[in-house]
């Protein structure tokens, strides 16, 4: 997702990940799988879910699949629909390839990108290149906190960012309160606050969208 400010770029930045299991180059290397399902709320009202599945061994290649589906309703009428699916391949903490397809209330966007040697090339929708290691908005990866640029999977733009600590605060996850540590992603639009448990697991996200409305992710 691009950084929040306008609804589409925000949701774009928030949504970026894949669903294929990567085969490790090292046959004896353990392969692990992690999965996250987030309940998504707009101004406290549930609008859908965003699911992530990460497969593979970090030392070889990992694949992340991200699937989101949101519907915003008023008086039972669907005013806005959003669907997003992204598949990312990772080598260590660097993005090796990305393919994303987004339907933002009827407007469809496809993004594809690939790392080639020391260069990262975005081939669609608009060609763009960057040198060195590039990450997407990979909230699950602790290396995100040290980045100064991130790939927006909906627009295909590589965005300059600044990431700062927020400290600790209680976070409501369903009926329980969890001690959470936050990090804020500053970018071209409104900031995104990302929350982690004491064990370092990604458990939540807060951002402002159109009209000052608050979009929240909470781990289920």
Model-based region annotation:
Residues 1, 6-11:
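N-terminal export leaders
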Residues 17-23:
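N-terminal signal peptide c-region/cleavage motif recognized by signal peptidases
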Residues 24-117, 122-126, 132-220:
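Acidic, serine/threonine-rich low-complexity disordered tracts
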């Amino acid at each position: 997702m691009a950084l929040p400010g306008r609804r589409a770029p925000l949701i774009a930045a928030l949504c970026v990940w894949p669903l294929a299991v990567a085969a490790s180059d090292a046959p004896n290397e353990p392969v692990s799988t992690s999965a996250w399902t987030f309940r998504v709320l707009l101004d406290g009202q549930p609008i859908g879910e965003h699911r992530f599945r990460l497969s593979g061994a970090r030392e070889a290649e990992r694949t992340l699949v991200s699937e989101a589906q949101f519907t915003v309703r008023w008086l039972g009428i669907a005013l806005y629909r959003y669907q997003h699916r992204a598949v990312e391949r990772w080598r260590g903490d660097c993005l090796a390839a990305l393919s994303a397809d987004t339907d933002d209330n009827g407007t469809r966007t496809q993004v594809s990108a690939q790392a080639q040697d020391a260069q990262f090339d975005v081939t669609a929708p608009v060609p763009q290149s960057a040198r060195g290691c590039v990450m997407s908005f990979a909230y699950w990866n602790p290396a995100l906190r040290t980045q100064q640029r991130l790939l927006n999977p909906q627009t295909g733009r590589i965005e300059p960012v600044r990431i700062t600590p927020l400290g600790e605060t209680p976070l409501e996850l369903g009926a329980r309160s969890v001690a959470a540590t936050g990090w804020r992603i500053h970018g071209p639009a409104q900031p995104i606050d990302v929350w982690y448990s004491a064990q370092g697991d990604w458990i939540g996200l807060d951002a402002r969208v159109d009209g000052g409305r608050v979009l929240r992710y909470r781990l289920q």
